């Protein structure tokens, strides 16, 4: 994912979501 794609999923930071999304998409 790109940073923008990660952010669009509602996360606080790109790094947090790069980890969280594969783990369960929180």
Swiss-Prot record:
The keyword Hydrolase does not apply. Induction: By water stress. One of its GO terms (biological process) is photosynthesis. Its main location: plastid. It is found in: Plastid, Chloroplast thylakoid membrane. Keywords: Chloroplast, Manganese, Membrane, Photosynthesis, Photosystem II, Plastid, Stress response, Thylakoid. The keyword Membrane applies. Residues 1-26 are annotated as: Disordered. GO terms for cellular component: chloroplast thylakoid membrane; photosystem II. Belongs to the PsbO family. On the 2D-gel the determined pI of this protein (spot N146) is: 5.3, its MW is: 29 kDa. Stabilizes the manganese cluster which is the primary site of water splitting. This is Oxygen-evolving enhancer protein 1. It comes from Pinus pinaster. The gene is PSBO.
């Amino acid at each position: 994912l790109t940073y923008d794609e990660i952010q669009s999923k509602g996360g606080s930071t790109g790094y947090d979501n790069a980890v969280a999304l594969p783990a369960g998409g929180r």
